[in-house]
UniProtKB/Swiss-Prot annotation:
It holds the Pfam family MscL. This is Large-conductance mechanosensitive channel. Channel that opens in response to stretch forces in the membrane lipid bilayer. May participate in the regulation of osmotic pressure changes within the cell. The keyword S-adenosyl-L-methionine does not apply. HAMAP family: MscL. InterPro entries: Mechanosensitive_channel_CS (IPR019823), MS_channel (IPR001185), MSC/AndL (IPR037673), MscL_channel (IPR036019). It is a multi-pass membrane protein. It comes from the Bacteria.
Amino acid sequence: MWKEFKEFAMKGNVIDLAIGVIIGGAFGKIVTSLVNDIIMPVIGRLVGKVDFSNLYINLSGQQFNSLQEAQAAGAATINYGLFLNNLINFLIIAFSIFIAIKQINKLKNFTKKKEEVQVEATEKDCPYCCTKIDIKATRCPHCTSVLEEATN
């Protein structure tokens, strides 16, 4: 059983997935910091010194000075400021992944086209029986017709 697990864990796809998850987690933290510490304070400053993470709708009817006070008191709140932060966070990550995948696909298509250009024909059609034959053949192995000229 240990041997099977070891073979499974050492396959390239599993290791690639693990590396992707680790890098993705780190990337997510960087983007979250970018949104919370750089982008949202600038946007908040532009729209009148608003801290978006502190924007909420109080559903309890009581008065609170901040979201933290409302949550500490157990009040029901709609935290639309945190939602906006998370939405911007998601959009940045989604756009970054879109750009990365677009570049990877472009690279794959470039190498695929390069490989297609290098492929040379190795077969031709017999003009008499229309079967595929070797391009260097001087006689068709199927219908035994003599071919005029071997093309290279």
